[in-house]
Regions:
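Extended hydrophobic/aromatic segments used for targeting, binding, or gating
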Residues: 185-186, 191-208
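A common structural junction motif
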Residues: 79-85, 194-195
Length: 224
């Protein structure tokens, strides 16, 4: 059995208060799901990338499963996921196979590397996540506009969104890329990106951080 990661984004026209309350209310139900190894209920940032301002119309759900079968059972049969689908106006779903993951999220690395090879033309998903040191918050947020501009100008990025557990302190992003080569070009050749990465290490911004790279498979959920 290979681990399966699913990341879903739900956008709301109505039911926004319900969506906000699910950040806490969904946790007991998720804890009881057979085969679940890790999960996070996540808010999102306004606009694209990191943002000081929340997007109260969009929320995300990250789940990690011991197998594709347990993930499928949850997505097909869970009353919780059906309520998300019914109450939201639109959704984006990403089925993720881990290619690489290093660092920690809540004192653990939840993503196990898949043994399957990357297929030609597969899209790439990137999750970056960090808990910021309180003393470094102002420095970090001063650099956010430059970081957002760098990814906006990156060749091959198809979509990206800021996500997080707590505003200001626990921040993450998910980005979808056309190819692994274009991810590497951005990581190693972008002067803006390289400067920011260097500064994070030099200034010790993060109490905890994680970087994970995934192969992305199409995932379409239907609801009544």
């Amino acid at each position: 059995m290979e681990q399966q990661v699913v990341l879903s984004f739900f956008s709301y026209d109505k039911n926004r208060f319900w969506a906000f309350t699910q950040m806490q209310r969904a946790i007991p139900q998720l804890q009881q799901q057979p085969g679940i190894q890790f999960f996070r209920t996540l808010g999102t940032g306004a606009g694209l990338g990191f943002s000081l301002w929340p997007d109260f119309s969009t929320y995300a759900l990250l789940t990690v499963w011991e197998s594709e079968a347990s993930a499928t059972a949850f997505l097909d049969n869970s009353s919780l996921i059906k309520s998300y689908l019914t109450k939201s106006a639109s959704q984006k779903h990403f089925q993720l196979d881990t290619l690489q993951s290093h660092g920690l999220w809540g004192k653990t690395n939840p993503f196990e590397t898949s043994q399957r090879p990357l297929e030609p033309d597969e899209k790439i998903g990137i999750i970056t996540r960090a808990t910021l040191r309180p003393i470094r918050l102002l420095e970090f947020w001063r650099e956010v506009p430059a970081a957002s501009k760098a990814i906006q100008q990156a060749k091959g990025v198809l979509w990206y969104k800021g996500i997080g557990e707590w505003p200001f302190v626990q921040q993450a992003t998910f980005s979808l890329w056309n190819s692994l080569e274009e991810v590497k070009d951005f990581a190693y050749k972008s002067t803006h990106h390289a400067a920011i990465v260097k500064k994070t290490r030099k200034r010790n911004w993060y109490k905890e951080d994680l970087f994970a790279r995934f192969a992305v498979r199409p995932l379409h959920l239907k609801h009544d």
